[in-house]
């Protein structure tokens, strides 16, 4: 009986584990260089979105993933506002092979962080007295696959 319990416990320890520990805003900025004059103009915005992720290994199977969303909104030729959020999370991830770990950090974790970053940006923009900013969902799996393909074409790099 004890041998069976020990075997089950060791199998549980070797099983893949994923746990969200914390989500937080790492950095936040908002600039409205043409206010208040921009508020008196006809509103015909064009939105530019830059998206970036990075990850850093912390101690004992903990990883920080940072999703950066940078939005530049122009009204005609003038910049109405620039907003940026770095939404971060600390994740406990263990017992994954290299490919699964890479996918988890590069696609799965950013997918968790995106709704928080989107809401933070929207709140920031409306506090700046601009119309709500409704960002469409992002397919991080597709972005991750594109990045892998680009890396392989550039240098034959593989995920480790």
UniProtKB/Swiss-Prot annotation:
A Pfam family hit: SecB
Residue spans crossing the bilayer: none
Top-level taxon: Bacteria
Keyword Transport carried by entry: yes
BP GO terms, sorted: protein folding; protein tetramerization; protein transport
One cellular-component annotation, GO: cytoplasm
Cellular location(s): Cytoplasm
GO molecular function, one term: unfolded protein binding
Record keyword Coiled coil present: no
Keywords: Chaperone, Cytoplasm, Protein transport, Translocation, Transport
Subunit structure: Homotetramer, a dimer of dimers. One homotetramer interacts with 1 SecA dimer.
Protein family per UniProt: Belongs to the SecB family.
Function of the protein: One of the proteins required for the normal export of preproteins out of the cell cytoplasm. It is a molecular chaperone that binds to a subset of precursor proteins, maintaining them in a translocation-competent state. It also specifically binds to its receptor SecA.
Protein name: Protein-export protein SecB
Source organism of the structure: Pseudomonas fluorescens
């Amino acid at each position: 009986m004890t041998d069976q319990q020990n075997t089950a416990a060791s199998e549980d320890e070797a099983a893949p584990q994923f746990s969200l520990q914390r989500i937080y805003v790492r950095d936040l900025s908002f600039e409205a260089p043409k206010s208040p004059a921009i508020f008196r103009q006809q509103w015909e915005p064009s939105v530019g979105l830059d998206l970036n992720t990075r990850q850093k290994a912390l101690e004992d199977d903990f990883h920080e993933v940072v999703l950066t969303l940078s939005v530049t909104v122009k009204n005609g030729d003038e910049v109405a506002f620039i907003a940026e959020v770095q939404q971060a999370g600390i994740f406990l991830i263990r017992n994954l092979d290299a490919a699964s770990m890479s996918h988890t950090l590069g696609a799965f974790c950013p997918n968790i962080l995106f709704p928080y970053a989107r809401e933070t940006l929207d709140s920031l923009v409306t506090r700046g007295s601009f119309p709500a900013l409704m960002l469409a969902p992002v397919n991080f799996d597709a972005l991750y696959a594109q990045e892998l393909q680009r890396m392989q074409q550039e240098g034959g790099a593989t995920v480790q």
